[in-house]
Amino acid sequence: MAGIGIVDSVSNHSVDQTVDRLKGILQSRGLTLFALVDHSGEAEKVGIKMPPTRLLIFGSPKAGTPLMLAAPSIAIDLPLKILVWQDGEGKVWVSYNSPDYLRERHGFPAELLQNIGAVESLAAAAAG
């Protein structure tokens, strides 16, 4: 049920397990986890129930800064984000913005695509 430019993959793990796996992968690759937003936890605080939904915001200034220098508007989409969420049927998903879509959206040079291309392998490793 992906929107424009969003890649969705099924996870073989629970939301908590997928998030933990992703945190470990980020650390092992030397990436900084800037924030972990627990959307469902925040919703619960105001009396609204929703399935587990967590957003990880991460990156590396070494990879992101050249992109922002080439196309300043990409700063609205950086740091990178991976959403881990559970649908109404209990299936867990890992979602992220397609690097190709971000390139098309912001118009940065093709040679810089590798700076954000790792999001695909990160998501796959966390979901697998």
What are these regions (language model features)?
Residues 81-109:
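Beta-strand/loop substructures that line and gate deep hydrophobic ligand-binding cavities in soluble
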Residues 1-29:
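Terminal, regulation- and interaction-focused segments at domain boundaries
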Residues 104-128:
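Well-ordered alpha/beta subsegment
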Residues 18, 22, 39, 63-64, ...:
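Amphipathic alpha-helical interface surfaces
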Residues 34-83:
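Compact, glycine-rich, soluble single-domain proteins
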